[in-house]
């Protein structure tokens, strides 16, 4: 399951996130719902979530600052901006810092599941790419170990590149 943390300063939105979204169906585990950006950053450091859902306007650290922080420190983390503002400058900032999706609160029940599906799809693709790269590295490591072993066993003999 993908680990999700969320932050919104409005209590009814926090409750909606906890109770109205079928997280298990989305293959997600909502591990924490917080009320400000500073708590969210602390939680990100402790929990290492795969997906972060954040409101824009919150006390202390706002959601756009959280988005920028994740872009700079944990670029693989998928960010979903949840906001009451359809302001183009906010959307532009979110795009600049690689937010996965921008969801308006008035359509949270319709758009958030789609945004989560998009985020989990990106994470699944990223995981496959990492596994593929790790497999290639492992194969190269095995080949280098075989070459090293051969050279160690035969270093006193004449070895030409043609022979190898």
Identify what each model region corresponds to.
Residues 42-148:
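CheY-like receiver
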Residues 25-35, 43, 91:
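Short hydrophobic/Thr-rich beta-strand motif most characteristic of the beta2 strand and flanking loop
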Residues 11-32:
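Two-component/phosphorelay signaling modules centered on CheY-like receiver
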Residues 2-13, 17-18, 52:
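Conserved acidic segment of CheY-like receiver
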Residues 144-164:
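DNA-binding recognition helix and immediately preceding turn/loop
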Residues 4, 30-31, 79:
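Hydrophobic/aromatic residues located in beta-strands of well-ordered beta-sheets
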